[in-house]
Structures are given as structure tokens and as C-alpha cells.
Amino acid sequence: WKPWKGASWWTAASEGPRGLPKAAGKADMTPLEAFQILDLRVGRVLRAEPHEKARKPSYKLWVDLGPLGVKQSSAQITELYRPEDLVGRLVVCAVNLGAKRVAGFLSEVLVLGVPDEAGRVVLLAPDREVPLGGKVF
């Protein structure tokens, strides 16, 4: 997965595959509208295990997103986290990007992180307890 260079090429006016907007010109939406297309929710990791079949070191995660249910994610976060440290953690997930099969495992949500100075992924998370499935805005 590579981050978008900018979301201004999306428009909410027409739906593409998986319910995502089709590409459009930059004048079609404001930066705020582009941000609002992403459905970012808070979840809690219920289970984490090494993803042995993945080409890059990864974990299989099962994330409870409250009313959205439990969703799976394949996450390349092995440098800073052990599976046992992930269970019970709150995480932020993009839930409307569509599912993708990663080495036989269906990844339904993208768990969000940011690279540290060494390029290792640091998870994004609220600093207090919040309702599972809560929308990030």
C-alpha cells in the first residue's frame, strides 16, 4: 500500500468499484470533502498472530469495530510490536477502502500508522478509551 499523493482527484458525485468515488479533476472537491470520503474508525485488537505466508513480515489482526463487527487486517508492524502487545490495544482503521487478499488472508481494513525516524511503523491510536467503531473526524 502506498499513500495517496492527494485525495483531490476523488469526487463523491459518482461511485466506482467497492463504493469508492471515481477519479475526477481537482476542482471537484475541497480538501475537507476529500478527507471525509475516508471512513476512519476506532477498533480494539482482539487477536494478533504472525502472517507466516506474507512476503514481508506482517501480522494477521482481528479488530473489533463495535457496530461494524470484527474485521481482519494484515499489518506490517512487526518491528515495534509483538502479537501479545497488540491484543487489547485501540487502533485507528480505514474501513472503506475495500478488502484485499494478502497471501491468502482477507484484509478488510487498513490499520493506520506513521513511520518513525527509522521508517518503522508506529500505530495511530486515541490516548483515552473511546467507543469501538467511533468515527474519526
List each model region and its residues.
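Phosphate-backbone binding interfaces of nucleic-acid-interacting proteins
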Residues: 3-137
